[in-house]
């Protein structure tokens, strides 16, 4: 059963374009190496601003654990991605979620 890593971030005012560039250029390509699927990526337009949500899909809990460990050790993640985004994030919420069998599955 697919597992979803649902992440909500509050960014510093005006930091959304810079954060999106870091994800596009480094963050997503690193996750791609470990077969992590981008299931959704959104940013606020109306209402509470400076919010981004990304949803990453994994085949199962074992894939989530394995990929999470590999991403954390990846040199591009540690040396290129984290330094770019650390100063942009004000708050973070993360949920690991499951999807029922009637919902679309990424794998």
Positions of PLM-derived features:
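An amphipathic, aromatic/His-enriched active-site/gating alpha helix that lines ligand/cofactor pockets
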Residues: 17-39, 48, 57-96
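Short, solvent-exposed beta-strand edge segments and adjacent coil->beta transition regions
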Residues: 4-6, 49-53
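A general structural signal for short secondary-structure boundary/capping elements
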Residues: 54, 88-89, 98-106
């Amino acid at each position: 059963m697919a597992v979803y890593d649902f992440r909500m971030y509050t960014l510093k005012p005006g930091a959304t374009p810079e954060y999106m560039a870091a994800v596009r250029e480094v963050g997503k390509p690193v996750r791609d190496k470990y077969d992590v699927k981008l299931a959704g990526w959104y940013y606020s337009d109306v209402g509470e601003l400076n919010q981004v949500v990304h949803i990453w899909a994994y085949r199962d809990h074992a894939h989530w654990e394995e990929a999470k460990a590999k991403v954390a050790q990846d040199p591009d993640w540690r040396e290129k991605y984290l330094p770019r985004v650390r100063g942009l994030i004000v708050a973070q919420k993360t949920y690991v979620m499951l999807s029922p069998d009637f919902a679309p599955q990424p794998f």
